[in-house]
């Protein structure tokens, strides 16, 4: 995938393209290169703050790197400026999940899914908030919903498997 990005950057002079930077950050995040994805997200923030704010990868890298204050600021900035976007409530839910206020996180993930029922990252966050409270049935339902929304994506299936392992349900 990096070769394709390199060709686009060199041949078409798209090195500063916010769309390309966002795509690279997402690819790095999916390859578990969280720090590199975060660095690109910060570059995206400088170039295109609107696209940065709409990017689940921007939110997820802050979550995964335990950047509580940055995530708090971004989440509340999004909620204030874009209350009709699922990313806003997803970010707020991620913040509350990060500080282990799981029931509060659930309510914000639920709000994100009510704003856009097809926003799969919120369903995964919703499942994680349920799993953190040992509510396995609800967690599995949320992960299955995410799996239906993203057929072929491994992430919801990974969370389903992790939930089976967590509950020692090996059937």
Residue locations for each model-derived region?
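Conserved structural position within tetratricopeptide repeats
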Residues: 10, 43-46, 77-80, 111-114, ...
């Amino acid at each position: 995938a990096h070769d394709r990005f390199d060709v686009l950057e060199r041949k078409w002079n798209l090195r500063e393209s916010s769309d390309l930077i966002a795509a690279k950050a997402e690819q790095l995040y999916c390859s578990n290169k969280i720090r590199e994805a975060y660095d690109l997200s910060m570059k995206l923030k400088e170039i295109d703050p609107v696209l940065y704010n709409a990017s689940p990868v921007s939110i997820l890298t802050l979550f995964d790197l335990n950047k509580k204050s940055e995530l708090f600021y971004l989440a509340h900035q999004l909620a204030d400026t874009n209350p009709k976007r699922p990313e806003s409530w997803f970010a707020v839910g991620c913040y509350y999940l990060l500080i282990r206020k799981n029931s509060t996180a659930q309510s914000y993930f639920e709000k994100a899914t009510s704003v856009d029922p097809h926003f799969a990252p919120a369903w995964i966050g919703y499942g994680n908030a349920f799993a953190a409270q040992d509510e396995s049935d609800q967690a599995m339902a949320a992960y299955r919903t995410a799996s239906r929304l993203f057929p072929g994506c491994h992430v919801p299936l990974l969370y389903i498997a992790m939930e089976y392992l967590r509950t020692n349900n090996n059937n």
